[in-house]
């Protein structure tokens, strides 16, 4: 990918967040001064004073923009990534949220960093997604994409749910628990991590299945290849919901079947050349620094 392709850049901010207005307009002016055409997402533009830049829907952005810069947190980045994945528009994230696992630029240094990135000094990272489909009596009743994870959860019910898990047509285990998380490497640092799952490097083509509060302690997280097909059969339950990225949800019924597999498309993230996944983990998760020897 060459930076000369970035003739039109879309700016997308966290909706209804006044904190993004000043950095977004500053960024728009910075890009315009460099001869780049700037367009704004329609929902973002609805909350700022704008009479200068064209306003497009996300679908129009997908068809017209060479790059999308997202100002917000990981939640905003997840939503925009899912919407733009059919168009293969690369994304740069500027963190205006809390942790910022996906948004690694800061508003304070974005101009300096973008100088290098727009000159072609960046690294491309392709992130995998999941497709999930629910069938009921042989008919499809729910389809969605997940960038982070697919979660089956008991909702507000006090009882456990019962699931039967198959991988590539082979029975793996039955599970009585509060739920089950199926996470991508991107999602391995989200809900799956807080439920005891492993951290997966985003360059790996893997998925992890992480039980939520299992009744049997031997039900541990497992890691499988991304080319696998997961089938989950829903057994007796009072209430169970399926969530994708905590965004879309659907009520499941007994005997429903859930099919999860890797999406053929990927999300293209652009990082500065000095980006380090391990440094990011240290900073976001508060890991200790290098041990120093005592000098005596």
UniProtKB/Swiss-Prot annotation:
The active site is at residue 74. GO terms for cellular component: cytoplasm. The keyword Transferase applies. It catalyses: NAD(+) + ATP = ADP + NADP(+) + H(+). NAD(+) binds at residues 74-75, 148-149, 176, 178, 189-194. The keyword NADP applies. Its main location: cytoplasm. Pfam families: NAD_kinase (PF01513), NAD_kinase_C (PF20143). Its cofactor is a divalent metal cation. GO terms for biological process: NAD metabolic process; NADP biosynthetic process. Its EC number is 2.7.1.23. It comes from the Bacteria. It is an enzyme of class 2 (transferase). It is found in: Cytoplasm. GO terms for molecular function: ATP binding; metal ion binding; NAD binding; NAD+ kinase activity. Coiled coil: none annotated. Keywords: ATP-binding, Cytoplasm, Kinase, NAD, NADP, Nucleotide-binding, Transferase. InterPro entries: ATP-NAD_kinase_N (IPR017438), ATP-NAD_kinase_PpnK-typ_C (IPR017437), NAD/diacylglycerol_kinase_sf (IPR016064), NADK (IPR002504). NCBIfam families: PRK01231.1, PRK02155.1. Belongs to the NAD kinase family. Involved in the regulation of the intracellular balance of NAD and NADP, and is a key enzyme in the biosynthesis of NADP. Catalyzes specifically the phosphorylation on 2'-hydroxyl of the adenosine moiety of NAD to yield NADP. This is NAD kinase. It comes from Nitrosomonas europaea (strain ATCC 19718 / CIP 103999 / KCTC 2705 / NBRC 14298). The lineage of its organism: Bacteria, Pseudomonadati, Pseudomonadota, Betaproteobacteria, Nitrosomonadales. The gene is nadK.
């Amino acid at each position: 990918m060459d930076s000369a392709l970035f003739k039109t850049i879309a700016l997308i901010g966290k909706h209804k967040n006044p904190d993004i207005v000043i950095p977004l307009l500053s960024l728009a002016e910075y890009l315009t001064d460099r001869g780049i055409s700037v367009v704004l997402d329609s929902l973002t533009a609805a909350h700022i004073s704008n009479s200068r830049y064209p306003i497009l829907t996300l679908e129009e952005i997908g068809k017209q923009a060479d790059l999308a810069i997202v100002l917000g947190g990981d939640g905003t980045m997840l939503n925009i990534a899912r919407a733009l994945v059919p168009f293969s528009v690369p994304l740069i994230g500027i963190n205006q949220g809390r942790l910022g696992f996906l948004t690694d630029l800061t508003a304070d240094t974005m101009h300096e960093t973008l100088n290098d990135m727009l000159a072609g000094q960046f690294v491309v990272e392709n992130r995998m997604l999941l497709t999930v489909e629910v069938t009921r009596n042989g008919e499809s009743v729910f389809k969605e994409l997940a960038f982070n994870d697919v979660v089956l959860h008991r909702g507000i019910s006090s009882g456990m749910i019962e699931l039967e898990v198959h991988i590539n047509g082979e029975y793996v285990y039955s599970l009585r628990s509060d739920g089950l998380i199926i996470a991508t490497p991107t999602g391995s640092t989200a809900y799956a991590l807080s439920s005891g799952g492993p951290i997966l490097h985003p360059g790996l083509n893997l998925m992890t299945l992480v039980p939520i509060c299992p009744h049997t302690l031997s039900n541990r997280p497992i890691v499988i290849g991304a080319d696998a097909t997961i089938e989950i059969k829903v057994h007796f339950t009072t209430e169970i919901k399926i969530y994708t990225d905590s965004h879309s949800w659907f009520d499941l019924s007994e005997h429903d079947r859930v099919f999860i597999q890797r999406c053929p498309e990927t999300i293209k993230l652009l990082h500065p050349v000095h980006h380090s996944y391990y440094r990011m983990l240290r900073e976001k998760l508060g890991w200790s620094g290098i041990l120093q020897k005592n000098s005596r």
